[in-house]
Amino acid sequence: MIHTERLLLRRWTDADRDAFAALNADPVVMEHMQGLLSRESSDAFVDRIETHWEAHGWGLWAVEVPGVAPFVGYVGLWPADYLADGMVEVGWRLAAAHWGNGYATEAAHEALRVGFEEVGLDEIVSFTVPQNVRSRRVMERIGLVRDPAGDFDHPRVDPVAYPHLVAHVFYRLSRDEWHRDARSISWTTFPF
């Protein structure tokens, strides 16, 4: 469990499952994903998250805003080994009602710190579809840098059903860059 200035980043509980299923069934939240998730698929994702935590000691946190909401979504680190062996991404998915408060930026900044300082990662990446401007802004605000040479067609996106979601832009940050820039990056500077 980690406390940031406004957030509690914690392991998942069964009480999070209803809110997570609602988030995954929201077309606004899932606009840049391959459709909505059923309750069964949403619960299976939580199970995978918890299994990963048990095996590795890190993963996607449930995000709580104490005094405001017991669950607003997730932020954290997740393997992206379908791109390259050992590659880890920082990612987030928050309920639309909580967008625009800086929660994703605040929590993702902490995820980078944990990834570099506690897990010992050499690099953390993130990626999304080009049209996902909100997520791209978060990536840039936490210090990730766009690497056009890394842009790719996502191997897990169905190109027939979701051709507009195949192409992805790629961002990265090394541990050395993080240590050099960490003091100058502040989530409080940004409204997302």
Which residues does each PLM region occupy?
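Conserved GNAT-fold acetyl-CoA-binding loop/helix
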Residues: 28-50, 58-59
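Short glycine/serine/proline-enriched coil/turn segments at secondary-structure junctions
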Residues: 52-55, 82-84
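Acyl-donor (CoA/ACP) binding surface of acyl/acetyltransferases
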Residues: 1-32, 62-192
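A general structural signal for short secondary-structure boundary/capping elements
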Residues: 53-58, 170
